[in-house]
Amino acid sequence: GLARAYEALRAADGFALLDLNEAQTLRDLGWRGPLLLLEGVFEQRDLELCSRLDLWHVVHHEGQIDMLSRHKTQVPQRVFLKMNSGMNRLGFAPQAFKSAWTRLNALPQVDEISLMTHFANADGESGVAAQQQVFEQFSSDLPGERSLANSAALLRHPAAEAVLADWVRPGIALYGSSPDH
């Protein structure tokens, strides 16, 4: 499945994946562009593979920052710092976001920090406005590219500022499914 998806999507700016094996497969297929691990790393040794394969990865808890601080690398990594703006699955609490950014920014193992969140209600009545407001309140003074929009935000709120961010993450829509179902 991944090889077929790659052939169909090879004009994409990047790919976001859940596991290191998928990232290795895309590199083996010849993809040299950005690869983002959406759940980040789970073990210290995962960072070695991130370095070797030039992977970007999400940082959503303190343990991942601790692992990065112990990582021995000659090539600093790009990370996506994730804020929990309402999904309540992964990410730093809004009040802890700047502190996490400061810790990451001080690490020589990190060369670029992008900022992200995930819209829990993009497919519902409440939309993205409340979560976008929380995200902006706690990140507006931080530098870095932004990634906020998921499939539901892209389809239901195409003119929203969040959709016009640097990176969007269509997921379920790539399979032809509506995020409403």
Language-model features: where?
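Active-site loop ensemble at the mouth of alpha/beta enzyme cores that anchors a bound cofactor
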Residues: 155-181
